[in-house]
Amino acid sequence: VHRYMILSEGRRQILSFHMAGDFADLPSLYLPVLDFTVGTITPVTVVGIPHEALRRLADTCPNIALWLWKDALTDAAMARKWIASIGRRSAYQRLAHLFCEFHARLSAVGLVQDDRYKLPVTQVDLADATGMTSVHVNRTLKELRAAELIALRGQELTILDWGRLVKIAEFDSGYLQVQKVATPKPQIDETGVSASAYAQRV
């Protein structure tokens, strides 16, 4: 799911991507008019919660109110990172940062395995999210693959060198407010016995 705006000349700007379990339109809880549209990229299951029911729940359950407030603040933090990327990062860094962000957010909901995750967005989607043309995105993806930072096969992205990608992107997951995820990685020792090692993510 993504939030987007269509400008007067018909061009689209993707404002954010949303993962499983996210509120895609939380601002509508208190704002009568939204300045964005919500669209889907893949088939999704949408759960609708009446505003009044959610407001009552927030009024009677302080922890729920705190969670909603935290979600809104995290949303704002992500928007600031995106603004910084589009305004000051190179094309190379923009895509690197976005792929790191996807990894951290999908890890938090158990959708990353061996640094590999589904990436159902098109190059046009990536362009509209990062302020580039689709041609520039295509060229930058080739550069990331040539540097052996990522592998992209169909709709599946694998991060080949997390440490280098994080350094290039200047990525720090703190703004996402997600738990650090330990990813099991099979290792074969010199005796041929498989053991599990855990790579701590930033």
Annotated model-derived regions:
Residues 42, 59-131:
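Polybasic "coupling" helices that flank or enter modular domains
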Residues 105-202:
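Phosphate-/nucleic-acid-contacting segments
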